UniProtKB/Swiss-Prot annotation:
Expressed in salivary glands. The lineage of its organism: Eukaryota, Metazoa, Ecdysozoa, Arthropoda, Chelicerata. The monogrins comprise about 4% of the total salivary gland protein. It comes from Argas monolakensis. This is Monogrin 2. Disulfide bonds join 28-82, 36-62, 55-78.
Length: 107
């Protein structure tokens, strides 16, 4: 896999503010890539298909399960999205396996 990858992700059911207020224990996180964002295996696996081929310092992809997936420029934006989920962060091993599994499904 090209580039430096730091990972975390959320396999979550639909999220509500009320759940977050009660200390939701589900897992949440992000995928951060330092490379050109584009139509890559990693972004396809996450359900993204960027038309734009723009090189930048980093691309942060947040997954929140039932909610739409989002691409941000900074980890701070992802942290804000994941605020309220108190479950343990996914390990890099779990995330790499998730990406591999989804890449097989999306071809």
């Amino acid at each position: 896999m090209e580039g430096k990858v730091l990972l975390c992700f959320a396999l979550l059911l639909p999220f509500t503010v009320a759940q977050a207020a009660k200390g939701d224990t589900r897992r949440c996180g992000y995928l951060m890539m330092q490379r050109c964002r584009g139509d890559t295996t990693e972004t396809k696996a996450w359900g993204f298909n960027y038309e734009e081929k723009k090189c930048q310092k980093e691309t942060v992809i947040c997954g929140t399960g039932g909610a739409p997936r989002n691409a941000f420029e900074t980890k701070k934006d992802c942290d804000a999205l994941c605020k309220g989920y108190s479950g343990p962060q996914y390990s890099m091993q779990e995330m790499l396996q998730h990406i591999r599994d989804n890449a097989k499904k999306t071809g």
